[in-house]
Amino acid sequence: MQKFLSLIIVILILYNIVKLKIYPEDNNNSTTIKQTTSNNSSTNEHQTSINNEPTISLNGNLFERTVSKIVINALKTEEGKIFFENILQPLNGPINPNDYTIEVHKDLVKTLFKINTFGSGNIGPASCGHVVTVFYQISDMNNNLISEDTKTFTLGSAPVMLGLDNVIIGMMVGEAREAIIPAKYTVNNSNNIIFDDAYNYKVTVILKSILPQNFVESNKVKIYDDEIAYRVPLLCGEKVSFHAKITRLSNGKILFDSKSKGQPLDMKIGDITYPLIFSYALQGKVQVGTRSVIAEGKTFKALGSNLNKIIAHESLPIHEYLLLELNDFKQIK
């Protein structure tokens, strides 16, 4: 289905380019008419409830109308929005002509939750598995306050809602964020807090503290994907099966390889008995291809735990750079 959609989009783009070159005046007139109509529209139309979607009039021949309907229906879902946005992802990053590896610049989680960040801080950033203290407010889409509290919890445990944990990731102490949590990410592990999973929610959160203060500095980590993303990404608190390989860059020595052991890893993103860099790399990854991560050895320590299920701390070259390769992803329900 995704290949079919990609083919349709490519055909539609080419069709419109040709049409634009042949009938430039018609397209300009159309733009003028649309702008005039838009300027004369009543402001009341913008106050329509998000649940009352306006009827869209489709023009053009049968092919154009059919493609338009497919695109419109796809864009009504979070998966569709992520898919269409990432079709253009290669344009946002350099491509290595040798292996077509794309450096990751696009944060799909910010897109998914429509995150806006305010203020600044110098302690952080928060990663999945950190223990954080936050003040949060949750409102419906009409800004009616539903819940507010100051709470301390482990990112990935989802005591309030899974989406909130993922909005906090990447924050510095003192920063504030606003976001919209899609209905499917309002699930939590609390019996005291219940949200209607048929609606989206607005959240505002202020990060007050992070423990322990072991951080992955984004400017010292390089992440590469060898396939274009076109699915909803993995999130903090979700479970995933995958293969991992750790290589010492200075001499090429393999320090860990799950494939050679014949057994994939089953991990909840945020598990503090795994290396911190694992949660950092998995959060926001789509389940395709191989993700390659170059990071300092110290980030391969388990977060806040002397138990490391992957590699013993005493054998880690903490001041050297290591290569982590993750692939064969399969989400565990």
Curated annotation (Swiss-Prot):
The keyword Isomerase applies. It is an enzyme of class 5 (isomerase). Residues 129-227 form the PPIase FKBP-type domain. It comes from the Bacteria. GO terms for molecular function: peptidyl-prolyl cis-trans isomerase activity. Residues 29-51 are annotated as: Disordered. Keywords: Isomerase, Rotamase. Gene3D superfamilies: 3.10.50.40. Its EC number is 5.2.1.8. It catalyses: [protein]-peptidylproline (omega=180) = [protein]-peptidylproline (omega=0). One of its GO terms (biological process) is protein folding. The keyword Oxidoreductase does not apply. This is Putative peptidyl-prolyl cis-trans isomerase RP395. It comes from Rickettsia prowazekii (strain Madrid E).
